[in-house]
Amino acid sequence: MDKTNVMRVLDQKKIKYTPHYYDNTITNGMEVANTLNLDPNKVFKTLVTIGASKRNYVFVVPVNSELDLKKAAIAVNEKSIEMIKSKELLDLTGYIHGGCSPIGMKKPFRTVMNESALNYELVTFSAGKIGYQVEMNPNDLKKLINITFSLII
């Protein structure tokens, strides 16, 4: 299988990861977890939002959970946040819906991952392309992006 830009970044930074591949017709996070036989608590989805200040933020939550917009707003000191429209995702991040990764976005955005990720040695999330996931230590994300961990679900 080809490597994605996310995988190349991880290779360049010498960060250990395990790639996972699945049928690229699957875009639902729970289906991805089931297909890969992974615990859905350890498989994360990447969500892009906009705050009342018009700043964009990235939130990374387990696929079996929903982002709590109030908790998310508090985590980034915003009055409120809302999800961006799907059609804005590609121009803003360089990724499409179902293939959005917290690593390698067009611009660096403040990113918050649900604190439950820290309960696990390894978590899995999109490698930047539908059909590709990377499994890695959540603490290693700090070496790559501006990320904090907070209760956002």
Q: Which residues fall in each region the model found?
A:
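Extended, low-hydrophobicity, polar/charged segments
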Residues: M1-I153
